Each structure stands twice: as C-alpha cells, then as structure tokens.
C-alpha cells in the first residue's frame, strides 16, 4: 500500500492503557521506537514517575501527549465527595497544562446510588465547575461516553448523544466529546 494513509503515522496516538504493564518511560520509548509521535497518557502512570520525569521522558523522545485519561468521576453521595472530585479534576487540568496536553478525557463516573438522573446532573454540574479553569489553562474537556455495561461503576454517560447534549448545554467551545470505538 505504498503512498496510502497507512504510511502516515503523524496523527496516530497510542493509548497508554494498551501497554498498561509498561512504565510511562517504556510506553513513550516504545512510541518513539515505533515512529509514533503521540501518546494518550493515563494519570496513574504520570503519578508513578512524577510530572517532571514524565515531561523529561516525553521531551527526550520527541513524543507529544494527545490526551490525558482520566478526569471526571463526578457523581458522589455527598457534597464533600463531589468537591473532592472537582478538586482532583483541577489537578488533572494542571497535569495537562504541565505536559503541553490540550485534552483531558472525562470518564464521567458511575452511579453512586439508584438515581441515574441525579448522577447525570452531577456530571454536568461537575464539568460546569471546572470549565473556566480548563479554559484558563487551554485544556479542552472531552466527554467520553462508555458502553452502558459500565454505567454502574464507570460512567452514567453511555451514548454519544448524551455526551453531545451535555456539551451543548454547557455551551463552551472548550467542552466536546471523545469517542472510543470500543464503547460505541
């Protein structure tokens, strides 16, 4: 397939979770060795090595961050728990900015009780609480709908249309939707 789109890897990004057993360094070096210029990082791997080391490894290998997973996880039973989740999203936005990443992937959070409508409202309220901070740091918020089988524990946002509806209601160009073909 000479000259085909498959020869151009300039827009291909590796989701770090596909190499979850690797350290951040191993994943970034693996991208570099494979000719990939982009990686989607996971926060747990950033935290394992620290933000400064992550930045160094990325720079040393010429690999850029396409997105950081995961922010979100907004629904909670108490106001204090919701605020703790919002505060964690502020830290995630800071991590994006420090790694020159313009997109925080939001896995919105599962069902803390039996009130699906309230959980979805808390998702929108949570995004609204962080959007101005994201704008100030030039970080986009990408709402990722997950397959409905994950509604109980990972995300009460299960469809593309639900994601688009939330983004539209928030009304900021900084809020959009990211899709993982596994979930749609």
Language-model region placement:
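Conserved phosphate-coordination/catalytic loops
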Residues: 18, 22, 83, 87, ...
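Structural motif corresponding to the early beta-alpha repeats
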Residues: 37-140
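Boundary/entry segment of secreted carbohydrate-active catalytic domains
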Residues: 2-24
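Generic detector of intrinsically disordered, low-complexity, polar/charged segments
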Residues: 1, 22-27, 64, 106, ...
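Active-site beta-loop-alpha junctions enriched in small/polar residues
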Residues: 15-19, 42-46, 70-73, 109-111, ...
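Residue-identity detector for threonine
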Residues: 18-19, 78, 103, 159-160
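Acidic/histidine-rich catalytic cores of soluble enzymes
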Residues: 8-9, 25, 29-32, 38-39, ...
């Amino acid at each position: 397939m000479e000259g085909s789109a498959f020869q151009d890897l300039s827009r291909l990004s590796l989701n770090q979770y596909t190499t979850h057993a690797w350290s951040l360094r191993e994943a970034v070096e693996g991208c570099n060795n494979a000719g990939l210029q982009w990686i989607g990082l996971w926060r747990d791997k950033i935290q394992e090595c620290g933000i400064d080391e992550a930045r160094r490894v990325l720079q040393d290998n010429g690999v850029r961050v396409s997105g950081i997973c995961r922010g979100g996880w907004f629904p909670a039973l108490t106001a204090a728990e919701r605020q703790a989740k919002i505060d964690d999203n502020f830290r995630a936005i800071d991590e994006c900015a420090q790694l020159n990443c313009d997109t925080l992937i939001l896995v919105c959070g599962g069902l803390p009780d039996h009130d699906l409508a309230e959980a979805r409202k808390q998702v929108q309220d949570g995004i609204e609480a962080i959007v101005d901070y994201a704008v100030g740091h030039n970080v986009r918020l990408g709402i990722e709908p997950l397959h409905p089988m994950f509604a109980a524990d990972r995300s009460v946002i299960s469809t593309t249309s639900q994601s688009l509806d939330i983004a539209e209601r928030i009304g900021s160009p900084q809020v959009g939707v990211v899709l993982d073909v596994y979930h749609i």
